[in-house]
Design a protein with these regions (language model features):
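Short, glycine-/small- and polar/acidic-enriched structural segments
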Residues: 30-161, 167-172, 176-182, 198-205
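Cleavable N-terminal signal peptides
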Residues: 16-17, 27, 54
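Pocket-lining segment of extracytoplasmic ligand-binding domains
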Residues: 88-89, 165-256
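Secondary-structure end/capping motifs
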Residues: 221-303
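Sec/Tat signal peptide C-region and signal peptidase I cleavage site
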Residues: 23-29
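Small-molecule pocket liners
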Residues: 106-112, 207-211, 215-216, 291
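Bacterial N-terminal signal peptides
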Residues: 11-23
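Conserved C-terminal helix/tail region of periplasmic/extracytoplasmic solute-binding proteins
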Residues: 292-329
Length: 329
């Protein structure tokens, strides 16, 4: 177990684990410590496969799964991790941390949902408690944005990492209002048709998950970072072209060995739907501008979107080099 996991063991969920396999011919002497503020699920299979491909190219990737995106971000800020997964815009602005996003992994694709025994529409959630993924996450931003749009205020927000966990909590009656991903939506519709209502969201274009790192790390480990970015982009494009490719990648790299039959059956449907919105060019300046529009409205960022500078939040060096090499889609 690496130092990051030891230092914050108390915050790591019971299912947390490390993937640390040294690849031959490593590109640098030090491992690349990646902190992911979630559990490993079907939704992260393509990322896990891309990390395995980076290992094959000589990058010693060490992945640690943590309780929340907030913990992952703090691990990067404190130097306990090199790279984090999330969208830490509020942290970047308020803490003035020398951290920059260098690649977009996914855009927001979520579904606010309520138990119809208690609620029917957004107005019904005024003064009620909701559950989201984690503090500062895209799920929280969406729910706060919709509260503002509908003139309501929640009584409290519970942080429940993992869309699958929130879906299960709905089915068990432990949560009455939350936000789930496309897999959760299908599960709810299949297992309890008519019991849950999906609230209207409108069009949302913003980063859900991205890779971010300390600026010194990005400069000192440029070769490793470029290998990682290329591995992710090529994997994303392969999956977008053929969602069934994720099944073969899971088998090849022996990923999620403890997945249930239901989870395995969900792989192709999930990625068939996700393929349409996967960022095949890693985001970049246009994605940053979309994020400024969304996260200023949701309250995660302060100021006017037009006044925010991309370079204060993103480092596009590695992404630009890789897309110049492999082209854009």
């Amino acid at each position: 177990m690496n130092q990051l996991a030891r230092n914050i063991r108390a915050s790591v969920s019971a299912v947390a684990f490390c993937l640390a396999v040294a690849a031959p011919g490593v590109a640098s002497a030090d491992p690349m410590r990646v902190a992911f503020g979630d559990i490993a699920t079907v939704e992260s299979l393509h990322l896990l496969a891309a990390l395995e491909r980076a290992k094959e190219k000589g990058v010693d990737v060490q992945m640690t799964f943590l309780k929340s995106e907030d913990i992952a971000a703090q691990a990067v800020v404190s130097g306990q991790a090199d790279i984090g997964v999330g969208a830490p815009y509020a942290l970047l602005q308020k803490a003035k941390a020398p951290i920059r996003i260098f690649m977009q992994l996914s855009t927001l694709q979520f579904y606010p949902v309520v138990n119809t025994d208690f609620y029917k529409e957004w107005k019904d959630l005024d003064g009620q408690e909701i559950a989201v993924h984690s503090r500062g996450s895209g799920t929280e931003a969406i729910m706060q944005l919709m509260a503002d749009k509908n003139g309501i205020e929640y009584s409290g927000i519970s942080y429940v990492p993992g869309a699958e966990v929130r879906t299960g909590a709905l089915l068990q009656g432990n949560v009455k209002a939350t936000i789930v991903d496309s897999s959760g939506k299908r599960v709810l519709e299949d297992k309890a048709p008519g019991k849950f209502a999906f609230l209207p969201l409108g069009e949302v274009a913003a980063t859900d998950e991205a890779l971010f790192a300390n600026t010194d790390y990005l400069s000192a480990n440029a070769a490793d970072v470029e290998i990682l970015v290329e591995a992710i982009l090529t994997t994303w494009r392969e999956v977008a072209a053929d969602p069934k490719a994720v099944i073969a990648l899971r088998d090849k790299y022996k990923l999620l060995p403890d997945a249930t039959p239901d989870m395995v059956a969900d792989i192709e449907p999930y990625f068939t739907e996700a393929a349409a919105v996967m960022p095949l060019n890693g985001g970049g300046e246009a994605a940053a501008r979309d994020d400024f529009d969304f996260y200023t409205v949701s309250g995660a960022l302060e100021g006017e979107p037009a006044d925010l500078k991309v370079e204060d939040f993103w480092d596009l060096t590695a992404l630009n080099k890789v897309t110049a090499k492999i082209g854009t889609k």
